[in-house]
Amino acid sequence: MKNTFDPLRIGDKSFSSRLMLGTGKYRTSEDAINSIKKSECDIVTVAIRRLPTNINSDNISFLKSLDWEKLWLLPNTAGSQTAEDAIRMAFLGHELACQLGQEDNFFVKLEVISDPKYLLPDPIGTLKAAEFLVKKGFTVLPYINADPMLALHLEDLGCATVMPLGSPIGSGQGLNNLANLQIIIENANIPVIVDAGIGAPSEATMAMELGADGVLLNTAVAQSKNPEQMAFAMNLGVQSGRLGYLAGRMEKKQYANPSSPVSQISKIY
């Protein structure tokens, strides 16, 4: 069940789900479609480089099966090795959004990755592309390493979110840099979406308990034994973590503290 009373706001849009789901690596298109439905996500990200921009192509027939009146497309620039390449992908992403009936959609998940082995984002290329796209009116969601200073620079440029990685893309290693993620979250005045590396619902919960505003994942669902079930589990994990964060964790204590009252108890002799 979505929490409509605690919306995620990105740019001028509000979303009831704080889970974003990718569309790659699924065994079948049916798995992708059913997982998206089961996750109850509002935002679906699509790698533009890996798709033709013609919505009538058979290669992206699964996109036509999704309800774009309920879902919001987040085109991503995955595969871009330079800022210039990412900028071109962003404009192609907007064209695809228009073909899906979302003419007002200028969202882009900005990825500039020049390293083919470790797939770590290029901070210089990301800054360069972000500055250009923000000036062109795009709602930019940059994928970055867990670098607190870079996050602040991107916020200053006008990015709508920052998306620090939990661990390398597709690794399933979970949250490897909790300290830096916490610093980014504490200092940001824009939403922080933890992106990449999450492999289990408990890790999605942990990200939300830290205070992240949302989680984006793909491989953890797509490559699980039961993608639909994992999508539902991730949905619950994100909601649980968010509610726990809002409720506030109890203070840790050095010594044990009884949970039952110890005063005003009659002694029985």
From Swiss-Prot:
GO terms for molecular function: thiazole synthase activity. Keywords: Chloroplast, Plastid, Schiff base, Thiamine biosynthesis, Transferase. Transmembrane segments: none annotated. 1-deoxy-D-xylulose 5-phosphate binds at residues 170, 196-197, 218-219. Its EC number is 2.8.1.10. HAMAP family: ThiG (MF_00443). This is Thiazole synthase. It comes from Thalassiosira pseudonana. The lineage of its organism: Eukaryota, Sar, Stramenopiles, Ochrophyta, Bacillariophyta.
